[in-house]
């Protein structure tokens, strides 16, 4: 698929899911857009503890949406985003499973990022039948680049 076809599919998903922002991407689609769309950024909105103990995506912009400990909203989220990401470029948000990144995409839209996207499944994906993550969906299970520690 071309970048335009991927973004059209993401927009169609957003319409089906009644999402107000640019679209919803699978991890594989997000990686393709990030690699090939001029200026595209992947923003990881997990906590510092998650980056440190679960893993990083090399080259991703890291801005906590909620701070750890306590899961309090990061009052500087939008200003940090504006400092690091061009409002005209595609910006994709990823978290553990897709919930916080949805909220980040909403905040970005409100801040003037018209092409903001949520990465479905997130970094770790959903839990499997045994209650474990990283086996069903997600960035890691898709075999996309990440490092630990």
What function would you assign to each model-found segment?
Residues 93-94:
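Short, surface-exposed ligand- or partner-binding patches at beta-edge/loop junctions that are enriched
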Residues 44, 98:
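Conserved G/P- and acidic residue-centered "switch" motifs that form tight phosphate/ATP-binding loops
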Residues 1-40, 48-90, 101-149:
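Rhodanese-like catalytic fold shared by cysteine-dependent sulfurtransferases
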């Amino acid at each position: 698929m071309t970048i335009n076809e991927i973004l059209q599919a993401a927009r169609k998903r957003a319409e089906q899911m009644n999402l107000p922002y640019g679209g919803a991407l699978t991890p594989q689609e997000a990686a393709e857009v990030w690699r090939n769309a001029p200026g595209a950024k992947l923003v990881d909105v997990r906590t510092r503890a998650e980056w440190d103990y679960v893993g990083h995506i090399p080259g991703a912009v890291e801005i906590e949406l909620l701070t750890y400990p306590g899961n309090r909203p990061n009052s500087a989220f939008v200003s940090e985003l504006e400092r690091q990401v061009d409002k005209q470029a595609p910006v994709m948000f990823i978290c553990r499973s897709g919930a916080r990144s949805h909220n980040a995409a909403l905040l970005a839209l409100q801040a003037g990022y018209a092409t903001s996207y949520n990465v479905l499944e997130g970094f770790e994906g959903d839990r499997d039948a045994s209650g474990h993550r990283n086996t069903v969906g997600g960035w890691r299970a898709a075999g996309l680049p990440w490092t630990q520690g």
